[in-house]
Structure formats: structure tokens, C-alpha cells
A protein has these predicted regions:
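Nucleic acid-binding interface residues in structured DNA/RNA-binding domains
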Residues: 2-118
Length: 118
């Protein structure tokens, strides 16, 4: 790796660490029986339009986070195969109801209180 690329990555690192911490805080605030979309988590953390970064964070490290409570827009479970089945099972165990393959958003959508994040 070239020196200038290393320096560039180091300059970015504090920003991405702070962003990931904000996402994690938002995810932890989602109570049992409620869900939020990737976009809602990103917006609540102060980074609207960063929904893909929320997904990337959950792919990298979901230990200690209630990852199952983060879903796709429209209530879809975005994970495929066994992981998707596990997410659905975990949500059902928390009392989340589905309409077909989608979470009943009207009943289970979490309303973030961002003023509680500070």
C-alpha cells in the first residue's frame, strides 16, 4: 500500500468509527418487539442516506447488537437463506407479527427519540 493511501485511510478512520458507534447506539435503542429499517437507523444516527453503511456494519460485527431488529424498507427481511430464517424466528420470538414475508410495520415500527442518544 502506498504511503499516501495509508495516510488517507488514517484520516478517515475517526469519522467512520464515530459513525459506526452512532449506528450501534441507534440499533441498541430498538426495543424488543419493534423494528427499524436500515434507512431509519442511519437517519436517527445523524447520517441520512447511509443505509448501506448500516448494513455493512451489521455484516462486519453484529455481536452485542440486536441485529434482527433492522430490516429492509417496506418490512422485508433482506438476509437470504438460513440467516433470513433465523432473523424471522428471532423477531417472532420477540412478538413481531408478519404479513406474508413482511413485518407488519404499522404495528412494530420503532419511533426513534434521537434526543435520548446524547
Amino acid at each position: 500500500m502506498m504511503r499516501h493511501e495509508v495516510e488517507r485511510r488514517l484520516r478517515r478512520a475517526p469519522k467512520s468509527v464515530a459513525r459506526d458507534e452512532a449506528f450501534a447506539k441507534a440499533i441498541r435503542s430498538i426495543p424488543k418487539g419493534k423494528v427499524a429499517t436500515y434507512g431509519q437507523v442511519a437517519a436517527a444516527a445523524g447520517y441520512p442516506l447511509y443505509h448501506r453503511h448500516v448494513a455493512a456494519l451489521l455484516r462486519r460485527t453484529h455481536v452485542g447488537l440486536p441485529w434482527q431488529r433492522v430490516i429492509g424498507s417496506g418490512g422485508e427481511i433482506k438476509l437470504k437463506g438460513v440467516a433470513g430464517m433465523e432473523q424471522r424466528t428471532r423477531l417472532e420470538m420477540e412478538g413481531v407479527h408478519f404479513r406474508g414475508k413482511r413485518v407488519d410495520i404499522t404495528e412494530h415500527q420503532h419511533k426513534f427519540k434521537t434526543w435520548e442518544f446524547d
